[in-house]
Amino acid sequence: IIDIMKKESRKRLYTGGIIGPVAAFLYCVGYYHLVLIMNEQYQAWGWICFFVNCLGIICGGAYHSHCAYFGLIGRHAHEESMNEIVKYLGVQKYFVFGLQGIGFLALAVFIVLGWTIMPRWMFCFSPGILFFLAPLTRKLPKGLNIAIGGGWTNWISIIYYALALITMYVYK
């Protein structure tokens, strides 16, 4: 990734670094649906799931913003600095994926238990379950594996939120 990023323009690196936190904010707005879909007696669990997911995606936005360093510092061949950044991001990713994993697992469990207005089949399309399909995207034909596999976490959100909007409209 460093070899690719260090060839990018400064403008693209700055823009890419800023997109992460902005996207995190938008995801937090979207995560509010976790409160809206909960049956009334389980609202507190919806709020907990909302806050866990928000914290995870905020850490993810910060993680994304640090990727600009791969290009900004990488082009100057500061190997020691790059090694520190790689180590730091290696630690930070556990917070991102850990928190998001807990939040997504909670959502899947809530759907299966019938705590939400979502039909139980939505479990199959919940982000935590779709995430496990990531290894299959690497088996797609060349071109598709990059278009779909490279942006799989984005596709997860597109699939889930499209179906969530439909089911919220139909079942509410």
Where are each of the predicted segments found?
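Hydrophobic, aromatic-enriched alpha-helical segments typical of multi-pass transmembrane helices
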Residues: I1-K172
